[in-house]
């Protein structure tokens, strides 16, 4: 099939998630080409999925309906962004900040498929969680993932923009995490077709400079966070200084950056002052 195009790592991924063929199964076939392995779908069906990926730039995750992320296998669709590996670090940052003392209340703003919310629910089963999204379809997807992967944990779903649906909880949110849209609109055309043509632009594009959503989100952050509460944001690879400046201008303190897996500053955090008067 690789003669038709595509990357071997993507074909291996499809065989694994779509066909139930593990990496070790593939290695055994390389050693013994006459060997047999069981597959969950017919080769014809897998070939159809591969051609859709090659010819229509369909994301493999959409074709099989799932995406592995951290220790989870999440249901995904075109209703929300496919969770990226680097976003796993947002969860790591939140967990490290909490240490051995889970927050009483946390929130995931722009939850999408619910990847972050599910992870935080599983890490902090006794905490009160909130997941917010502007898209009703994304919230429906998040609800499915929360029900399947964190059925015993408490997480309320809220439909609306950023902090607004959480006004009843302002001043109580101790840890808040968000992966907002941050791609500058002039760069949209440069994105890979698999992203540009099949993932929701409302969750990708952050205006002309990519900071529109982040500015909006920061307006109410000092009011909505609990005293000493922290906000973690993911941003574009070249926005670190700008996002930190915006956090300070909004009144947050202890502002700092954190790097992604490649050593690039892709995350920012800031706190509401313990004794802030707003």
Predicted regions and their residues:
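Flexible, glycine-/basic-rich loop-and-beta segments that form/coincide
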Residues: 274-278
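Class I S-adenosylmethionine-dependent transferase superfamily signal
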Residues: 94, 120, 195, 217-221
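Conserved AdoMet
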Residues: 15-96
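Mobile active-site "lid"/loop adjacent to the S-adenosyl-L-methionine
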Residues: 182-213
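Non-catalytic nucleic-acid substrate-recognition regions in nucleic-acid-modifying enzymes
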Residues: 1-10
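Residue-level signal for inorganic ion chemistry
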Residues: 14, 57, 87, 116, ...
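Conserved Class I SAM-dependent methyltransferase catalytic core
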Residues: 208-272
């Amino acid at each position: 099939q690789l003669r038709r195009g595509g990357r071997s790592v993507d074909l291996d991924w499809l065989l694994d998630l779509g066909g139930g063929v593990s990496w070790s199964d593939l290695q055994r076939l390389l050693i013994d080409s006459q060997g047999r392995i069981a597959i969950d779908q017919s080769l014809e069906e897998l070939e159809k999925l591969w051609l859709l990926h090659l010819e229509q730039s369909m994301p493999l995750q959409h074709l099989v309906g799932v995406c592995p992320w951290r220790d989870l296998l999440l249901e995904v669709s075109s209703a929300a962004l496919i969770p990226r590996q680097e976003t796993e670090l947002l969860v790591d940052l939140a967990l490290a900040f909490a240490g051995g003392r889970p927050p009483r209340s946390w929130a995931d703003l722009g939850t999408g498929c619910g990847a972050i919310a599910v992870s935080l629910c599983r890490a902090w089963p006794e905490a009160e969680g909130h997941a917010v999204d502007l898209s009703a379809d994304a919230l429906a997807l998040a609800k499915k993932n929360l029900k399947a992967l964190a059925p015993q944990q408490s997480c309320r779903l809220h439909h609306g923009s950023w902090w607004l649906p959480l006004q009843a909880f302002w001043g109580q949110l101790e840890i808040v995490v968000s992966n907002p849209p941050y791609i500058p609109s002039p760069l949209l055309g440069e994105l890979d077709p698999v992203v540009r043509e099949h993932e929701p632009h409302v969750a990708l594009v952050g205006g002309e400079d990519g900071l529109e959503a982040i500015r909006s989100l920061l307006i109410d952050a000092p009011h909505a966070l609990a005293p000493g509460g922290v906000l973690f944001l993911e941003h574009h690879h070249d926005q670190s200084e700008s996002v930190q400046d915006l956090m300070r201008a909004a009144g947050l303190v202890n502002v700092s950056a954190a790097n992604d897996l490649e050593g690039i500053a892709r995350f920012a955090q800031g706190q509401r002052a313990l004794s802030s008067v707003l």
